[in-house]
Amino acid sequence: MEEEGSGRGGDGPAAHGRIGDTASLGASCVRAGVGGDSPVMVSSASVRKTVKMSETCDFIPYVDDDDDGNSEEENSASSGILPCDGMQHDTPDYIRRGAAAARHRIAPLELFSGPSPPQGPPSPSPAIGGAALEATSNDGVAEPQVHPPEGISSIISTGGGEQETATMGSQSVHETLHIEENEGKCSCCGQLKQEYSLLLREKEECRRVLEDLMRENELKSRECHEAQASLHELRMELMRKSMHVGSLAFAVEGQVKEKSRWCQLLNDLSEKFKALKAEHQILLQESLECKKFVADATQMTTTIQQHVNQYASLECEFKDLKEKFTEETKERKDLYNKLIEVKGNIRVFCRCRPLNGEEIEEGASMAVDFESAKDGELIVRGHVSSKKVFKFDSVFSPEEDQEKVFEKTVPFATSVLDGYNVCIFAYGQTGTGKTFTMEGIEDARGVNYRTLEELFRITKERQGLFQYEITVSVLEVYNEQIHDLLLTGTQPGATAKRLEVRQVAEGVHHVPGLVEARVTNMNEAWEVLQTGSKARVVGSTNANEHSSRSHCMHCVMVKGENLMNGEQTKSKLWLIDLAGSERVAKTDAQGERLKEAQNINKSLSALGDVISALATKSQHIPFRNSKLTHLLQDSLSGDSKTLMFVQISPNENDVGETLCSLNFASRVRGIELGQARKQVDVGELSRYKLMAGRAKQDSKNKDAQIKSMEETIQSLEAKNKAKDLLTMNLQEKIKELEAQLLVERKIARQHVDNKIAQDHLHQQQQSKKPENSPCPTRSPMAERNLNSTAEKPVTLLKDLGIARQMFSDSNTDTYSINHLMSMSSEKENNPAGGAQPTKARRVSLCGGAHQQPAAPPRRGSLIPLPRRNSLMLPLPLPKPATPAAAASPLDMITEQCSSPLVIAPNDIRGGGGGGGRNKRIINSILRRSLQKKVIIRPPLMAAHQSGRRAGAGVAGTTTHGGGGGGVMRARRVPVSGGRGGGGVQHNREKERGWNNGTSLRQLN
């Protein structure tokens, strides 16, 4: 069974569960309860059945019916499916609890499972042999198993838990017990009785146990059926699981492929990882190096930052020092210049040569005393024991060498580099050592060499702060001609090229075409100067074996730039060795030497004239009298520093020339050039001054114009304000007058309508009278006095008295009717009263206002003035006392019209048709009057015309009535003052026409 069970197991090792057959235990119990007195011997052999459990939890072992070699008992025993430990995980809890209880209840069956007692006396205690409990768990742990006797085991094994099987088992047990009882009756009867009693009791107990087991068997049977159903379900689940496993296998296969692919990728990634790892190692090393570099860079950055900060601080300090240096340099320059100015811009040094060998042999004595030379004083003894004292800036005795002479000259070299023009020249009698002082010899260098050496020394010291460019040129003035000594192939005295002095734009004199050699060190500069000096004209005279026959002039141009502030300077250094003055009588010069001496003396004389003019501060300085002075104009005209070496001879035979030279030097020393400055062209300066004067004059004129324009603007603004105020007042007054005019027009229209109606009624009454009624004769219109009011009835004035207040002006005086009548009568009786001036008043309703044929009065209102005659139509025709009293009211209207509108009296005196015609004429007149407009002039035009009217009024005072008219103040129409009476008459006609238009407008 173990082999079969193992053959039906899984592939791997499985845990075998060995379960004792519970049926055999039940059979043994039955057999123990059956029988008589004879003991029952139970075989020790026990029937066991071992079932191998599968490894899988889902697998439930079962016994196949068709297995070969299996006994019927095994099949019968296997028909009842017993639970195994392998199923405990999937078996319900109630089944496991029942099995455990059954095992505990089966425990008393061990009494029947002992081995068979041997033949002989009975053992004191019954032994039940062959009973052994044995069980094997899935994990190999032994469990107790019960082995009943063979008969009981076989019966129980074939029972399966059913009732039939139990009955058959009990019968076989009884048979067996009976046989055994007979065999052992003789030996163990007593013992068996005891055992029998015990067995009976045990029988009952076993019976009860058997019943319990049967009940439990039924229960187990039901549980087995349920387990089979569960097994079927598990099989179906197993099939599903197998299908699922197949699908999982397929999926696993796909996963395997995927895994292989991923493995391939993993291999590739591994290779890449290895490569990356190697690269990582390289990068790690590089990163370490970079870290070192970063640390170094950080340290370097810190160092650089420190240096930058230090540089910034140093730069600030440098700027401060630069500013201080610039200020100190400027201050030093100013102080140095002031020091030179204190000493004198023109300084004179006197140097005396020693006596030569010939003079010593001749026994010549010294005429110059140098006792006070340290104080700058020099004493010259004359022929007649007279002494003359000269004072100079420095006096050098014959014993002093070149070095001591140059010690006093050093400051001028510094002035050249500071940007000032410097001129150093030697003056004196021929043979007094001028060339030696200026040029010297190899062992004793002169002023020229030492000055250039000092220039280059200072230039080297200032290197980095200043940049200098030095050029050198050499020329001579020979016989009043300029020669360039640096031109190659030039012979002494030859005039290869004619050079002239020109004035450049900056006011500096320059010689165009002059060779200027640029030099960078002392050797080059001295070589150029020596080249020019060798080409100088030198001749032999009685006074000197090597006499200079020309003025040798070395020009050193210095252009400097201050690298600190960019300031640029341009200066000039003249080193001049003048030719010596000669006395022709003493030297006995002839021919060419005489001409040279004359030109030399001429140029020196011109230099003396220039010095004299400078000393006396003359307005005109004769620089152009000589080429020498023309060249030295920019060095002697006040914008340079000048040093003069006056060379004298100590020989008493040369006292005259010595005194001349010393006197000339004294005059030079007395010149005050003032502060050094840049020279400006005089013509240009005068032109600039003229332009400045014109500009100032133009500025003054412009200021005056601006002032006058400001005053004009202020006055115009004041006038504009006044005119604006006047305009506002006039506008307000116009509004008031317009309102008043509307009211007056309405009242006038009503009054005129009433009068017209009365006139028509009166005409109708007159037309009804008989023709033989006396009709007053009327005089012709031309013979009537239009302005007379003698024939006007007083009743008419009384009728029209209502309109007196209506047409009065509040701003003008009005007369009462009685007063007007008295005035009218007085004027009629007194013809001279017409010549009296009349006031400009508004006309009242009485007729006396028209008795004076004066000009229309000035009105202060824009309201049209009503005419008296315009309000007197139609009038009744009273009985006339004179023919002049027959004037009709319409004649009064026509009398006021100076326009072409004239209405005949016959038109009014006509019949009924004539009245309609008159009405139409009056309506047309009224329509025309309504179309007229009142013209309001602007304030400016009115102010402009007021002056003209004032003049016209003055001229018009003598034009009316043969020179007796009043003053007329025309307002509407300006009157020309040159017309006399004609202008006044013209103005009167215009006023009358305007008033007529106003009267007709009132009728409407």
From Swiss-Prot:
Transmembrane segments: none annotated. GO terms for molecular function: ATP binding; microtubule binding; microtubule motor activity. GO terms for biological process: microtubule-based movement; microtubule-based process. Residues 115-125 have a biased composition (Pro residues). Residues 63-75 have a biased composition (Acidic residues). Residues 948-958 have a biased composition (Low complexity). Keywords: ATP-binding, Coiled coil, Microtubule, Motor protein, Nucleotide-binding. It holds the Pfam family Kinesin. Residues 1-21, 61-90, 110-169, 759-791, 946-1004 are annotated as: Disordered. Residues 345-671 form the Kinesin motor domain. PROSITE patterns: KINESIN_MOTOR_1, KINESIN_MOTOR_2. Residues 189-230, 266-338, 691-742 form a coiled coil. GO terms for cellular component: microtubule; microtubule cytoskeleton. ATP binds at residues 428-435. Residues 995-1004 have a biased composition (Polar residues). InterPro entries: Kinesin-like_fam, Kinesin_motor_CS, Kinesin_motor_dom, Kinesin_motor_dom_sf, P-loop_NTPase. Disulfide bonds: none annotated. Belongs to the TRAFAC class myosin-kinesin ATPase superfamily. Kinesin family. KIN-14 subfamily. This is Kinesin-like protein KIN-14R. It comes from Oryza sativa subsp. japonica (Rice). The lineage of its organism: Eukaryota, Viridiplantae, Streptophyta, Embryophyta, Tracheophyta. The gene is KIN14R.
